[in-house]
């Protein structure tokens, strides 16, 4: 059925298919090897930087003797002083840039301010209802002549509402330094809420 030429063609097709498969497999293997080498190289660089950064964070202590040295060592052990010295060295030689400072209130301050707001709302509600109750004791003729007194909240207290369940309110103070044009920084207070 098959002749000699058909058998040769089949063998030729089979050898070309296996060669194409081998070249694809070798190419895939080289790409995989290059990716593995790059990952190892990045890991080595990361570990080197971590190790190098860890060594520089430890403070260098100088050896000294005498009474003045004990006081100097006691002062250097305070964390506040170390932060000041560190910030001084970090900011040395850098020009001042326009910046934004965000300061958040602590939870205790927020709890007291929210409590004060609720008390203020209750007080204002009492003020609106007390004149109405006082007018009821007057004669009916006088009551008809007087217009009802409405007490409106200011815009500051109107924007503050009671907290919702599962919502955290926080207040930020944003200080904006506008550079050389406006030498005094300006601050803005902004409230926002976050869901838990």
From Swiss-Prot:
Annotated membrane topology: Single-pass membrane protein
Pfam families from the UniProt entry: DUF4642
Keyword line: Membrane, Transmembrane, Transmembrane helix
Residue spans crossing the bilayer: 26-46
Top-level taxon of the source organism: Eukaryota
Subcellular location: Membrane
Assigned GO CC terms: membrane
Name used for this protein in its record: Uncharacterized protein C2orf74 homolog
Source organism per UniProt: Mus musculus (Mouse)
Lineage start: Eukaryota, Metazoa, Chordata, Craniata, Vertebrata
């Amino acid at each position: 059925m098959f002749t000699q030429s058909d058998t040769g063609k089949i063998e030729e097709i089979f050898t070309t298919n296996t060669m194409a498969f081998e070249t694809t497999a070798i190419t895939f293997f080289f790409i995989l090897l290059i990716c593995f080498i790059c990952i190892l190289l990045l890991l080595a660089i990361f570990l080197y930087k971590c190790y190098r950064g860890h060594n520089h964070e430890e403070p260098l202590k100088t050896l000294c003797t005498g009474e003045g040295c004990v006081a100097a060592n006691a002062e250097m052990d305070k964390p506040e002083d170390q932060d000041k010295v560190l910030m001084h060295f970090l900011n040395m030689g850098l020009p001042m840039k326009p910046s934004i400072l965000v300061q958040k209130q602590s939870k205790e301050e927020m709890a007291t301010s929210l409590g004060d707001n609720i008390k203020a709302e209750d007080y204002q509600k009492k003020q609106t209802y007390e004149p109405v109750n006082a007018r009821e004791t007057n004669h009916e003729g006088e009551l008809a002549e007087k217009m009802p007194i409405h007490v409106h909240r200011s815009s500051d207290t109107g924007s503050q509402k009671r907290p919702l369940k599962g919502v955290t309110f926080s207040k930020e103070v944003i200080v904006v330094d506008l550079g050389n044009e406006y030498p005094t920084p300006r601050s803005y207070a902004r409230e926002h809420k976050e869901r838990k």
